[in-house]
């Protein structure tokens, strides 16, 4: 079993992210635009889906 503090830390780096709908880039949770040029720095972001 994984420790709760480690689980929270891992979740911060792996789960609490935003995803670009056009190029699927993994972005910080508070991002407003994508950082990638190939999708034109679009603002179409979604939160990363949570584990069940």
Curated annotation (Swiss-Prot):
Q: Which GO terms describe its cellular component?
A: cytoplasm; ribonucleoprotein complex; ribosome
Molecular function terms from GO: structural constituent of ribosome
Q: What is its main location?
A: cytoplasm
Q: What keyword terms does UniProt attach to this protein?
A: Cytoplasm, Ribonucleoprotein, Ribosomal protein, Zinc
What does the entry list as the binding residues for Zn(2+)?
20, 23, 34, 39
An example GO BP is: translation
Report the InterPro entries cross-referenced here.
Ribosomal_eL40_dom, Ribosomal_eL40_sf, Ribosomal_zn-bd
Described by its record, this protein's role is as follows: Component of the ribosome, a large ribonucleoprotein complex responsible for the synthesis of proteins in the cell. The small ribosomal subunit (SSU) binds messenger RNAs (mRNAs) and translates the encoded message by selecting cognate aminoacyl-transfer RNA (tRNA) molecules. The large subunit (LSU) contains the ribosomal catalytic site termed the peptidyl transferase center (PTC), which catalyzes the formation of peptide bonds, thereby polymerizing the amino acids delivered by tRNAs into a polypeptide chain.
Spell out the family assignment given in the record's similarity comment: Belongs to the eukaryotic ribosomal protein eL40 family.
What's this protein's name? Large ribosomal subunit protein eL40
What is the gene name? Answer: RPL40B
